[in-house]
Each structure stands twice: as structure tokens, then as C-alpha cells.
Amino acid sequence: MQRGIAWIVDDDSSIRWVLERALTGAGLSCTTFESGNEVLDALTTKTPDVLLSDIRMPGMDGLALLKQIKQRHPMLPVIIMTAHSDLDAAVSAYQQGAFDYLPKPFDIDEAVALVDRAISHYQEQQQPRNAPINSPTADIIGEAPAMQDVFRIIGRLSRSSISVLINGESGTGKELVAHALHRHSPRAKAPFIALNMAAIPKDLIESELFGHEKGAFTGANTVRQGRFEQADGGTLFLDEIGDMPLDVQTRLLRVLADGQFYRVGGYAPVKVDVRIIAATHQNLELRVQEGKFREDLFHRLNVIRVHLPPLRERREDIPRLARHFLQIAARELGVEAKQLHPETEMALTRLAWPGNVRQLENTCRWLTVMAAGQEVLTQDLPSELFETAIPDNPTQMLPDSWATLLGQWADRALRSGHQNLLSEAQPEMERTLLTTALRHTQGHKQEAARLLGWGRNTLTRKLKELGME
């Protein structure tokens, strides 16, 4: 059964022969060409699942061919073959939309694996997704049960102007939820004003919130409206409300009770109609117990509580969020959006993400710029992501997380200049497997050999080689 169609274009007949033989042996249907013009002629009647093109060819070179193919068949993955001296050209190929590049001389198994990835990616693009990704203009993405609860609350409050308190760790998207609450409310056409309590010096918070009269303090040369007046008729979002000083909390409570306030240095009351949405990453109940937050203000704000889960509690959303952020980053940078290899998606879902959705978004921006190929592989992920990926208790590790951790170890070792990684890693891997199998069989060697897929003589030899006799 054919697994896909691969086309090969190279003016070197030996390269064409080697690749055709390897890919045909892997179950692919192959067609070879000597020039880019031959490929373009063939594309008028049929289309492969992947094209491998040399970068240096007489007449039309690989980059010119790539450019024309992307204009006619933008989804067709093109793998550029290049000598080591052509790395600058390979970068240009990525910029023009190459799926990946294959450096010469290449390992034939790696070449087949790369072609397989490209074909899988292409064929997946041809099939409709069960759950279409929200466009980059969509505000909140989430299919996890905890996020569905958030959506239900937003829906139920769509006809209300009641106060809402949003709880969640930093980076979980509290301001996005506040925007959504405003946009789906009767106040949607009125202003949405946001103010971060933690970002304002304490001596300026009152002026920011309530405004000031001319001459109220040094530098107050004109009358200034505060955030409450700016948000009149709409919504005022007070982020990090837990950092609000106690004296300002008292004034805020009065505004919420009376609907009016005085500007700093003013004597005439200012009446406003404002909906308050507050957010914090702190435990406000604990702040109340510690005397750092007014209990009456807490109850005034805590009419409806929305809890935003950390990213580690909604792992099923991570692949979709990552694809969404890759689309946004590509749009911002004016490039084609990167694609995630399935193993990369799995690796992302295993990570701790202490910075939550914001950290994932920044990672996707980084990958859009720094990932080598059009498809993001696990080795493309920044190494610092894995520093928090290993659980304190090894028994908590997911079944296939060892592969990601092994890849990360190899990446660090290579960056440090290590060589002969296989000779270093293989004995440790075999020792671990042997120890585990022998423990599982209570030291019964023949049974341990069977579990490992070895013969008894092989196990005996390994025990001797590894000094485990």
C-alpha cells in the first residue's frame, strides 16, 4: 500500500537514485526530475505529497522553484536539500516557506523520517478538523471543563451589570475575561477602562482613580478626570485589586455604595454609573484575615466569583492555544505560521507552565522566530521550559515523558560540546531497563530477558558488560 507520493528534483543522478531507492523501499511512490522546469510542467497535471529539491541546480535553482510552488500550491511541503556551505541559503528557504531542509551528506533514515513527517503534515492539512481553530481575532480559547464553566458564567451575566471578582494566577487571562464580560453585557458600547493597582505608585492611585482639581497638588496644573469618570456608563476593570492600599479601599467602598466621589482637591461630588470588575492572583480571604483587605469591600466585590484555572489544569487546551498563538505571531511578523509536530504538542502538554497562557504565548512568539524548520520539533523548544518539567515524584511522570527528557538531555549535552552521546546514554538506558526488569521478576534472569526481548545469553553478557553480575 502506498503511503504517499514524493517527487525528487536534483541535477545529480546519484542523489536522485539514492533517495528514490530509499523512499520506494519505505513504501512511497517516487518520481524524479533533473530540473525545476520539469517539476513545474508536471505540477500542471498532478501534485505530490512532498517535494525534495536541491538548492543548487543549473537554470532554475531550488529557491526560485520554491517561490513559484508556494504561489501555485501554498500547502505543498517542500524540503530543500543543501550542502553545509549553503546554510545561508537554507535560511532564505525557510523565509520563503520551505517545510524543512536536508543537509548533504544526509543520513538516509533521517531523510525518510523527514519525508514521512512532511507527508503526514500535508495529508492532515487536506482533512477538515473536527474542531476548527478559532481565528486569531477570537478572544478566549478553551474546551477544558473549567473553561467551559467560565464561558457559562459570561453567558449568564450577559444581561447584567453586577460586580464580578476574577481569581487566577498571573498569566491566566484575567483581563481577557474582563473584556469578554464587558463586551457581552448591556454596557458593551460604553467605555472599558483598565487600571492595574500593582503598576501605580501608592501616592498616585487616588488621583488615577478619582481625578484631581487644578492646584490639588504640585504639578496639578489642570483639572483631570480619573478612571471612574472615564468609565462612566461602562466598565472599570481593577486588576490586582489585592494590592490596593487600605485608605483607597475605603474610598472605593464609598463609591460602590453611593455612586459618587470627590476628585482629589475637589468639593463638588461627581456622580457616575460604573460596573466594577476586579481581579487578583492573591487569596483575598487570607488578605482579609491578615488585615490587609477590607472585609466589607471584599463582600461588595465578591458578588460573582470567576475562577480561571492555571494552564496545567487545562492541558487539553494547550495544543489548540499554541496553534492559535503561532497564527497570531506569524501575522504580526508577516510570515507563514509554524506547525507543531505531534510529539511537540505532547511535549507542550506535559510542561508545568508556571507563567500560564502568557508564557505559552511568548514561547510561540519565540518559536516563530527561532525554530529552524516550518514544523516545530521537540528539540526546537527552548531548554528553560524543561527545567520545571520533571515532577518531584518520578512515579508521577507521564508514560512517554522519558523520550522528551532524553531529547532535552541530548540537546544540553551537544550544546556543551559533548560527543559520543550514544556510548554515554546507551549503557545507562540498558542498566535502568535491566534493573527494573530484574526487580519486576524478583531476580529471575530468564524471565527478565523475556520481558526485555533478549535471549538468556544476551542478558548474561549485558550484566557482565555493565558490571551488574
From Swiss-Prot:
Q: Where does ATP bind?
A: 168-175, 231-240
Effect of substituting residue 170 to A:
Prevents transcriptional activation at sigma 54-dependent promoters both in vivo and in vitro
Q: Which Pfam families match?
A: HTH_8, Response_reg, Sigma54_activat
Where would one find the signal peptide in this protein?
none
Q: Annotated DNA-binding ranges?
A: 445-464
Listed GO biological process terms: nitrogen fixation; regulation of DNA-templated transcription; regulation of nitrogen utilization
Against InterPro entries, the record matches this protein to: AAA+_ATPase (IPR003593), CheY-like_superfamily (IPR011006), Homeodomain-like_sf (IPR009057), HTH_Fis (IPR002197), P-loop_NTPase (IPR027417), Sig_transdc_resp-reg_receiver (IPR001789), Sigma_54_int (IPR002078), Sigma_54_int_dom_ATP-bd_1 (IPR025662)
**Protein name, UniProt field:** DNA-binding transcriptional regulator NtrC
Organism name: Klebsiella pneumoniae
Q: What is the lineage of its organism?
A: Bacteria, Pseudomonadati, Pseudomonadota, Gammaproteobacteria, Enterobacterales
